């Protein structure tokens, strides 16, 4: 639709984005993440300027982050291991089915494990008390388990009335609520530079989602020495740290995103 609009008004288009890739699906090639200049409909044809995330971190425009993959902690907790091989792709091939994720959660008691991790984060052995803990869950069940188990925890979901959501988030920013579990609604547009702890309590095949969720803690603030990214589902292993992401032009405008030498865009999932 937006391509038709641009063509109708016959204007030049300048795009600004922190995530220059989009999900594309086709019968022949399945699902893949494509660099924005290589998508159809073809709206953007050229990259005129780019900057690497690592450069912005070095210059202080973004906050430093510590990443904590918690794979081994689950084994210590109950002897289980989160296995992505048990997850099945949905019909588009772009993400996992709800049912396969739920079955894996039940197999490893993911709900109890999430409560255990958040309780530890509320009283860390090192690094000082956290300003706020924002938890990203896939389903409402995990978020509800947190509120039942940990006093002072609130839920924000697509069903939360607007005024109630605003009240919860203001209380969170004021330190009156220490933990907010959100179900797919604060991935983008949530402005809280002081936020220092993000818990990724869901698996994803989406680089854009991973980047956006990590981005909730990457905004700098004088009171924040370092943000924590706590990953319970193997996403760090899949995508790497955002500082590892590199935009690279292999020639003739064939841009792609790489992480630690591994190509993430314009390759089949």
Task: Label each PLM-derived region with a short phrase.
Residues 134, 142-146, 151-188:
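Conserved helicase ATPase core of P-loop NTP-dependent helicases/translocases
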Residues 1-67:
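Post-DEXD/H (motif II) to motif III coupling segment of the RecA-like Helicase ATP-binding lobe
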Residues 250-269:
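Cys/His-rich short segments
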Residues 42-134, 253-258:
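Conserved interdomain linker/interface between the two RecA-like ATPase lobes of SF2 helicase motors
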Residues 9-12, 44-46, 62-65, 151-152, ...:
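Short glycine-/polar-rich loops that comprise or flank the Walker A/P-loop
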Residues 11, 18-23, 55-58, 71-76, ...:
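Conserved nucleotide-binding/hydrolysis micro-motifs of P-loop NTPases
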Residues 60, 179-199, 215-219:
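SF2 helicase motor core recognition
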Residues 209, 216-247:
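Conserved segment of the helicase C-terminal RecA-like domain
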């Amino acid at each position: 639709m937006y391509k038709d609009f641009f063509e109708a008004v016959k204007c030049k288009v300048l795009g600004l984005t922190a995530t220059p890739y989009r999900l594309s699906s086709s019968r022949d090639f399945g699902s893949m993440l494509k660099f924005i200049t290589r998508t159809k409909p073809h709206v953007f044809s050229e990259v005129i300027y780019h900057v690497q995330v690592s450069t912005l971190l070095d210059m202080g425009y973004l906050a430093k982050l510590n990443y904590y993959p918690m794979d081994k902690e689950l084994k210590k907790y109950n002897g289980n291991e989160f296995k992505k091989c048990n997850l099945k792709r949905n019909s588009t091939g772009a993400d996992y089915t709800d049912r396969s994720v739920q079955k894996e959660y039940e197999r490893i008691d993911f709900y109890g494990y999430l409560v255990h991790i958040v309780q530890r984060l509320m009283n860390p052995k090192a690094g000082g008390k956290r300003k706020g803990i924002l938890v990203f869950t896939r389903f409402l069940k995990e978020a509800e388990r947190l509120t039942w188990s940990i006093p002072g925890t609130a839920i924000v979901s697509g069903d939360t009335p607007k005024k109630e959501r605003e009240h919860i988030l203001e209380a969170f920013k004021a330190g009156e609520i220490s933990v907010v579990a959100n179900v797919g609604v604060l991935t983008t547009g949530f402005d809280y530079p002081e936020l220092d702890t993000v818990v990724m309590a869901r698996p994803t095949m989406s680089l854009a989602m991973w980047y956006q969720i990590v981005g909730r803690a990457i905004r700098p603030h004088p009171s924040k020495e370092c943000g924590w990214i706590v990953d319970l589902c193997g996403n760090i292993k899949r995508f790497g740290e955002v500082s590892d992401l590199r935009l690279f032009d292999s020639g003739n405008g064939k841009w792609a995103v790489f992480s630690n030498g591994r190509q993430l865009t314009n390759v089949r999932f």
